[in-house]
Amino acid sequence: MRNLFNKNKEHRGIMPIGDGEVLSLGAQTNGTYYQSYNASYSTNWFGGKRPIQFSVGAYFSKQTDVSSNYYNSSYYNNYYNYLYGYGNYGYNNYENYYDPDKYVKLFGMSLGWGKRLRWPDDYFQLSVQLAYTRYMLKNWRYFLMTNGNSNNLNLSISISRTSTDNQLFPRRGSEFVASVTLTPPWSSWDHKDYKNLATNSQSSLYEREQQEKYRWVEYHKWKFKGKTYTALTSGQKCLVLMTRVEFGLLGSYNKYKKSPFETYYVGGDGMSGYSTSYAEETIGLRGYENGSLTPYGYEGYAYDRMSLELRYPFLLGNTTIYGLTFLEGGNAWNDTNKFNPFNMKRSAGIGVRIFLPMVGLMGLDWAYGFDKVFGTRGGSNFHFILGQEF
């Protein structure tokens, strides 16, 4: 990066070459209701002598909500149209009910370090990340906490092993990641009575007590993800069986101070797109709608997911296209003590993946969910996939 603006025989303009450093600047919006900005820098040769990874990043996002008038207007207009057979004619346009006094803002920074290990073998890697996030809420009804500011200081440690033979279409090998994220146990030394804090939502002190209770978020978060790839036929274009298993648990140091953030948002395509919040980890489960397994009031503090997937490549190389068919199951629980990896919501389906060098990985899946989720069956669902999945 130090030669970003220097010119020589091999380097013209502001396009750096050489050490694989990455500088990323990004912005995303859907118009009025969501904006996101991020910047990051990473290198695989920190210090210039050994293959040590280093990264630093920061981000800011804001999501707003609609005013209560939207729901009232929608109800009365739909009732009027039902009686007289009229259409809405745009009277309930979502954009017309933007409420700047209902929002959740997130600001975060992170510092990361990683190193390849030589034991047990050369495929292992150790990664450590120190991160800070500040949540700023105003009249936000999708969390246990609706108003105020909250802080999250955490340390993540992960060990991964990757031995696949191809990044775009693996035929053999495996991928495993085990991680733990820890915050300081603030409740162990602040001498506060969390059992009797913010328990009565009708109290005039409820919001103030919420702010006091969640000023510093505390939790311990455990995750495991694993994939294996097995070639069932010979040759470059071969039939491949992919198996997947993953699970996560979000625990608390104090049972009266469960974290309202960093829960699991389970169901659907698994992309971290528009949802009721951006302080959740998005987990896909095809055959069910986005977040349908963890609706408001039933936040996910534990989840599991298992998959069997058959893949066959139609085109290999810089542009890769392959089809797939799959069986999948998973579930989510709002209490870690109720975690049962064999109580799954099942689905099956087919799909296709396309990798284009200038675009990245894209996909489309059709899946059918066989089981009921909160009284409704999953049924037929289409899922759009953008980006590489673990």
Question: What are the roles of these predicted feature ranges?
Answer:
Residues 38, 42, 160, 223-227, ...:
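Short, well-ordered alpha-helical packing segments
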Residues 271-277, 337-390:
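C-terminal beta-signal and terminal closure region of outer-membrane beta-barrel proteins
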